[in-house]
Amino acid sequence: MSQERFLTVPSTGEAARPFEDLLDEASAALPADFPTSAGQVLVALDIDGTILTPAGATPRVLEGIHGLATAGAHVLIASGRALEGVIPVLGALDFTDGWALCNNGATLVRVSGGTCEIVEERTFVPGPILEEIASAVPGSVFASMPHPDILLSAPFPNNEIEGSDHRIVSMEELASTPTPKIVVRAADMDREEFDRILSSLDVSRTHEVFVGWTSWADIEPLGVTKATGLESLRARLGVPAAGTVAVGDGTNDIAMIEWAAFGVAMGGASDEVRAHANHVTAAVENDGAAAVMHAIMRRCGVGGR
């Protein structure tokens, strides 16, 4: 049995299916005008619930990422994680060159020779939203991600915040420090109640709020999503819109799934996420993302199944 090394989404319990069937379904779902040249393809991959299991990435996922990249496709990571949480995943993927979108699109990172450099970043001063949320969500704790620091209002449960440079600071310091993302965690509240409360607050109209698979929310500047970050990068790289692919499972992936020419929801995605997708693949533990990548390789006539 593989040793668990990563804190990520637990298994969905989805029944396994033959990989060849998943590959054939993904191949059939690709748009008719999808490019046949890998150099005209951009594939954006979410991390948690998409390419990462607690034991790491599967061999098929690694084959897909490196097979596409070797063929000339632009394969990038698009995660809600801060850069500090993305770096260990890049290491596990042996992802040494390319691009990563962190903080749900607020932070664009160039990866070169295994070194990460922030190229663009959108920040905001959280100020009043912290007071509003703290009053409405009793017992909530906060994290702010101004690279390279991680500022916490109190320790997070189960070491849920990645990275080693944690500092417990006052709410005043959190409120006044520019950041690309604020995390809110309410460990003693169920997800549905947490989501309901946040949706009723002004912050849900003045900022982007993404609730995860637990009572955890990422808060970004209004208008900053994975889709906005990807569109900026697509234009920078000169990739045609018809060659864009996005694969994810969470509500923070909806924008990029809608943006892509081929938007894919994972098998572990909720009905809300699936409704925005062109195709639904298998869950992360059943190599759903790998099937999509191998289907693109097949369409482009490069190595793979």
Give, region by region, the residue ranges found by the protein language model.
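Short active-site oxyanion
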Residues: 72-76, 96-98, 181, 242-244, ...
